[in-house]
Amino acid sequence: MDKNIDFRMRVLVADDFATMRKIVRNILKQIGFDNIVEAEDGQAALQVLKNENIGLVVTDWNMPNMNGLELLEKIRTDPKTAKLPVLMVTAEGLKENVVAAVKAGVNNYVVKPFTAEVLQEKIEQIFKKLAG
């Protein structure tokens, strides 16, 4: 695993499906993250971001109340969270969706279904790039 990653950081997993949150949580634990918090939609994720020190956000695109793209836009416009790494994990694999997420400032993008190895690699890519 990448030496650029501090596994003590708190990771926020935002997805409206509890099963998907559990899958992502289990993969994150396999990778080495133990400090994981969950949110069922973008609004709940914003509350977590307001109250907790988060080091990485893993978010779905399609969620009620506030989708992952709207969450990403709010993260990028708040000076407190503007530089926070965000990984979008979603079924939205159409080129225009990927482009919209990139334009909004996503750090990396994973299309469902995915493997633990793909999620790990995408996270490693984020932190390698951030390390320069």
Task: Identify the function of each model-found stretch.
Residues 18-37:
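Two-component/phosphorelay signaling modules centered on CheY-like receiver
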Residues 25-26, 70, 93-108:
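Alpha4 helix (beta4-alpha4-beta5 surface) of REC/receiver domains from two-component response regulators
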Residues 38-47, 68:
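Helix N-cap/capping motif at the beta->alpha junctions
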Residues 47, 69-82:
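Short amphipathic alpha-helix used as the core "switch/output" element in two-component signaling
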Residues 52-58:
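Active-site beta3 strand of CheY-like receiver
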Residues 63:
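Receiver (REC) domain active-site loop signature in two-component systems and cognate sites
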Residues 114-123:
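C-terminal output helix
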